[in-house]
């Protein structure tokens, strides 16, 4: 499953929509909820990012992301 994680680079400042960034992670999980939990845990262990939202990408959404040229899997 591929998840899109919306985040702020630091937890020190309050979130601002204009500074929200996104990354893509491939997570091995049996359910969407399990994948979200694993993704959040991985981000918290490996980065100082402030996670705002974690979204499971459907096949159509993934194709759209690939077509726009912004899609790149992140390895942590």
From Swiss-Prot:
Record field: catalytic activity: RNA(n) + a ribonucleoside 5'-triphosphate = RNA(n+1) + diphosphate
Keywords: DNA-directed RNA polymerase, Nucleotidyltransferase, Transcription, Transferase
GO biological process: DNA-templated transcription
Enzyme class, broadest EC rank: transferase
Pfam assignment, any one: RpoY
The keyword Protease belongs to this UniProt entry's keyword annotation: no
Highest rank taxon of the organism: Bacteria
Protein task: A non-essential component of RNA polymerase (RNAP).
Similarity remark: Belongs to the RNA polymerase subunit epsilon family.
Assembly notes: RNAP is composed of a core of 2 alpha, a beta and a beta' subunit. The core is associated with a delta subunit, and at least one of epsilon or omega. When a sigma factor is associated with the core the holoenzyme is formed, which can initiate transcription.
Identification of the protein by name: DNA-directed RNA polymerase subunit epsilon
Organism whose genome encodes this protein: Streptococcus uberis (strain ATCC BAA-854 / 0140J)
